[in-house]
Curated annotation (Swiss-Prot):
Pfam families, alphabetized: IGPS (PF00218)
Reaction catalyzed: 1-(2-carboxyphenylamino)-1-deoxy-D-ribulose 5-phosphate + H(+) = (1S,2R)-1-C-(indol-3-yl)glycerol 3-phosphate + CO2 + H2O
Sequence intervals crossing the membrane: none
Lyase in keyword set: yes
GO molecular function, one term: indole-3-glycerol-phosphate synthase activity
Enzyme Commission designation: 4.1.1.48
Family named by the database record: Belongs to the TrpC family.
Protein's name according to its UniProt entry: Indole-3-glycerol phosphate synthase
Keywords, alphabetical: Amino-acid biosynthesis, Aromatic amino acid biosynthesis, Decarboxylase, Lyase, Tryptophan biosynthesis
Pathway(s) this gene product operates in, as recorded in its UniProt entry: Amino-acid biosynthesis; L-tryptophan biosynthesis; L-tryptophan from chorismate: step 4/5
Species per Swiss-Prot/TrEMBL record: Phenylobacterium zucineum (strain HLK1)
């Protein structure tokens, strides 16, 4: 585990302990989840990647990304630009996120939403659903296979999708063994923070049959999108390059081509 992930995991375990003690059991909302993976499948077409557009105020590596930060307005802009799904950062200490951003963004659109959060306890899956999330993120660099399987099983129980994130060959093999059907390849090296799109090109050859492959990080231009589509990616998660634009809708349309 990288230094930054170790730091996040440590404070997240403390945070979850407090939240869990205050609310040990969480009832899911009556509304069924919006199908996250299904929306990506519908949006993907030959020569066109489905887009998971991310609502992210800041990051540890880049600091503040967008000062004019209005989650509902950003969600509507992404939807108008052609995004298939949303990803919303809720972690506060490292990303200046907040749980309220997820509910606010989701209520403004019809798109399925991923809660971009660092999960260290299956309790957080139920919490995510109660906040309106339709999908969760399982970062294999952060959890062992036992915990990953528990997170995925809890998501399935609640009718949610699980995006299983990998960074290298060993993690892709683990994702396959876990039966992941939605796999995200993070092009960012979590130790150096350098981004290399060839990570997706390399790991795509190992993706299990039937899994929907999402490429994440470092996607800025239509040329990047075309390159990643050629290697077998079916969807992309893009945040920073769109969040920095004055006209988010136009930037989203331009990226999708």
């Amino acid at each position: 585990m990288s230094d930054i992930l170790e730091k996040i995991a440590a404070y997240k375990r403390d945070e979850v302990a407090v939240r869990k003690a205050a609310q040990p059991t969480i009832a899911p909302p009556a509304e069924a989840p919006r199908g996250f993976r299904a929306a990506l499948t519908r949006a993907h077409a030959p020569g066109r990647l489905a887009l998971i557009a991310e609502i992210k105020k800041a990051s540890p590596s880049k600091g503040l990304i967008r000062e004019d930060f209005d989650p509902p307005a950003l969600a509507r802009a992404y939807e108008a630009g052609g995004a298939a799904c949303l990803s919303v950062l809720t972690d506060g200490p490292s990303f200046q996120g907040d749980d309220s951003y997820l509910a606010a963004a989701r209520s403004a659109v019809r798109l399925p939403c991923l809660r971009k959060e660092f999960l260290v306890d299956p309790w957080q899956v139920a919490e995510s659903r109660s906040l309106g999330a339709d999908a969760i993120l399982v970062i294999l660099a952060m959890v062992d296979d036992v915990l990953a399987a528990e997170l995925m099983a809890e998501a399935q129980r609640l009718g949610m999708d699980a995006l299983v994130e990998v960074h290298d060959e060993a993690e892709m093999a683990r994702a396959g063994a876990l039966g992941a059907d939605l796999i995200g390849v993070n092009n960012r090296n979590l130790r150096t923070f350098e981004v290399d799109l060839s990570t997706t090109e390399r790991l795509a050859t190992m993706a299990p049959a039937g899994a929907l492959l999402v490429t994440e990080s470092g996607i800025f231009t239509p040329a990047d999108v075309a390159r990643l589509e050629r290697c077998g990616a079916q969807a992309m998660l893009v945040g920073e390059s769109l969040m920095r634009q004055a006209d988010v809708t136009a930037a989203t349309r331009a990226l999708l081509g």
